[in-house]
């Protein structure tokens, strides 16, 4: 039973690492001014052409 517990803990730890690394790349892209995800200072609302931003930001294209 203890062995099964250890396997579950290790499996969840290994699976969670790649998702953390993927979000770091998105953060870098959002900070890049040339990216579609970058916010501009227009009218207090940013410009974002990424599909996830759709309801909150205008694309401006």
Curated annotation (Swiss-Prot):
Protein name (database record): Alpha-conotoxin-like Sm1.1
Biased composition (Basic and acidic residues): 21-42
Location(s) in or outside the cell: Secreted
Region span, Disordered: 19-46
One Pfam family recorded for the sequence: Toxin_8
Main function: Alpha-conotoxins act on postsynaptic membranes, they bind to the nicotinic acetylcholine receptors (nAChR) and thus inhibit them.
Positions of the propeptide removed during maturation: 17-43
Species of provenance: Conus stercusmuscarum
Similarity field: Belongs to the conotoxin A superfamily.
GO terms for MF: acetylcholine receptor inhibitor activity; ion channel regulator activity; toxin activity
């Amino acid at each position: 039973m203890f062995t099964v517990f250890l396997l579950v803990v290790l499996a969840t730890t290994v699976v969670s690492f790649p998702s953390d690394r993927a979000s770091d790349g998105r953060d870098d892209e959002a900070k890049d001014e040339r990216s579609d995800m970058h916010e501009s200072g227009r009218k207090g609302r940013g410009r974002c052409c990424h599909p996830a931003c759709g309801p909150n930001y205008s694309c401006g294209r």
